[in-house]
Amino acid sequence: MNTFLTSSFQNVRSSKRTDELHTVLLAEVLEANPQWAGYDWQFEYRLPVDGFGGTFDIDIAGFVNGELKVAVLAKAMNSNVNKNIKNYANTTIGEAARLTYAPGLDLEAVLFVSVLPRTAPRFNKAGEVVGLDNVLSAKARTNIGNIIEAQYGGLVQVIDLFFDIDNISEMLTSADFQTITVSNVDKVS
C-alpha cells in the first residue's frame, strides 16, 4: 500500500493507477480475509444485471465456481475530499442496493474500501494549495455506517483506510504532491 500511496497523486485518472490500486487492495483484503484466498479474482468485472436492471462494474470481484461471492468497490481520494464526501456517501448507498438486489446473486460480502488521507490538500484551478481538509472530521459528519448496517446487516461493509501525508503543511502546489511520503497507513481489518 505504501508504494502505491507515494505516487497516488500522479495520473489520478489513469488505468495504470487504478490497476495498482486494485492490486494492493486485493492483497489487503485477502490478508484480512484468508478464507477468500482460494477464490478466483477478477478486476473490472461487469455484472450483467444489477438491482436497477442495468449493468454494474465491480472493481474487484471474487468468484467460487463461476458465481460472484465478493464485490470490492474501491476509491482512492487524495484532494478536495470534503467537498465530495456527501456524494461519495450517496453513491455508496445506491451502489450497495444495486449489488445486493441484483437477481440471482448469493453474495458473501460487499466491501466499499476507500483510501484517503487524514488531511487532504484543497487545490485551486492553478494547482495551488488553498487549504487543507480535515477528512476525519468530514467523514464523522457523513457517517453512513449505521444506515448500511441497518439495511444490510454485515453483508455490506464500509472500510476507510486512512494515511498521513508527511510534511503536508510544507507543500504549496500540486507539483509538490507528485511523490509523497506517507505514514500511519491503516490496514483492512
Predicted regions and their residues:
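Acidic-basic catalytic patches of nuclease active cores, encompassing PD-(D/E)XK
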Residues: 1-45
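Catalytic cores of nucleic-acid endonucleases
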Residues: 76-133
